[in-house]
């Protein structure tokens, strides 16, 4: 739960928390996001969670650390340190380390019960307008009416 001293999210407003986590802390240049992994994330019958879900969690935390509606990911360097299994609660902690114009460097660590499972450096860019341009709009609500 966000406390009153924290910021409101300005980015990735339509994202589904089931797949990339729920923000638990959001401050200028910092974000923490929690993800409870579930069976539909499993890569095999033993419950190994596909690394893409952990990466998605880390990416979302990096975007929230920047917290601009026009932030995009340019590149990343990722290290998967330990396996994640169905039922694990993984928390991503993101901190903006540097800013050079529109380029932001964000360090992210994902932990399970305080044990690191992922580390990454994300190079993000804040663009002057949405990456799809000013005239592109899509109905992402799923409402066919």
Regions found by a protein language model. Name each.
Residues 31-33, 76, 92, 106-108, ...:
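Hydrophobic residues positioned within well-ordered beta-strands of beta-sheet architectures
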Residues 60-91:
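Hydrophobic beta-strand-centered segment that forms part of the acyl-chain substrate-binding groove
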Residues 35-37, 80, 126:
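Hydrophobic residues in beta-strands and at strand termini
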Residues 38-56:
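A conserved, well-ordered hydrophobic junction motif at loop->secondary-structure transitions
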Residues 1-3, 70, 84-86, 97-145:
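HotDog/MaoC-like acyl-thioester-processing domains
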């Amino acid at each position: 739960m966000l406390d009153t001293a924290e910021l409101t999210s300005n980015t990735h407003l339509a994202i589904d928390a089931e797949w990339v986590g729920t923000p638990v802390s959001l401050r200028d240049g910092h974000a923490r996001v929690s993800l409870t992994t579930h069976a539909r994330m499993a890569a095999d019958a033993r419950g190994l969670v596909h690394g893409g879900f952990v990466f998605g969690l880390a990416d979302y935390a990096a975007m929230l650390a920047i917290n601009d509606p026009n932030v995009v990911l340019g590149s990343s360097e990722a290290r998967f340190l330990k396996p994640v299994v169905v039922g694990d609660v993984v928390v991503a902690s993101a901190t903006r380390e540097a800013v050079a114009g529109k380029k932001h460097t964000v360090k992210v660590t994902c932990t399970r019960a305080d044990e690191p499972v992922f580390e990454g450096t994300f190079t993000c860019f804040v663009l002057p307008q949405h990456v799809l341009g000013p005239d592109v709009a899509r109905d992402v609500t799923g409402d066919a009416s």
